[in-house]
Amino acid sequence: MEISARNSSTKIIAVIILSLTTLVFILGFAVAWLAVTNRALIHEQRTVVTPMTYNAPFVVSETKADTEYFRMMTLSFLALRLNVSPETVDSNHAFLMSFVEPEAREEFKKVLQEEAAQIKANDVNSTFYTTEINVYPVDGRIDVRGVLKMWIGNSRPSTEIKTYRLRLKYTGGFTRIGRFYEVTNEK
């Protein structure tokens, strides 16, 4: 009688240990699966934002942004570069430089310094009025067409139709300017 009770309790303990081992493997698999899926959720989580001074909401995640976001950032960058006066040109250009990719900084800095020198020397005030924006989010290209009004000293404003192209990169939740230049002779 003692032998069969001992065998029976050994079998029960073996079944319990086997069940617990199986449960540990199942839980380990579940934790690994949750870690993988949560990582994707964290990095692909989208946030809808509607800023106070912009009339359309946009969607951003850590790795992607939609066309409305690129449109808003482009309007901000255009304002920093083109809506300037001798008093504001340095601070606007310095803030704009904080968004430029490190590889393009030296070249872009020279262009902005030349523009600032001309603006200060000729007492130029300018304002850009956007008429058309085309956003190509796949390659990060934004084409902007508009009217640039410039006042040189106290003279009447000169008006020119200009087209600018920006190359923007969005990574890690931050926008960088790859290029920002005027497009000429494009048909």
UniProtKB/Swiss-Prot annotation:
Transmembrane segments: none annotated. It holds the Pfam family TraE. Keywords: Conjugation, Plasmid. It comes from the Bacteria. The keyword NADP does not apply. Belongs to the TraE family. Involved in F pilus assembly. This is Protein TraE. It comes from Salmonella typhi.
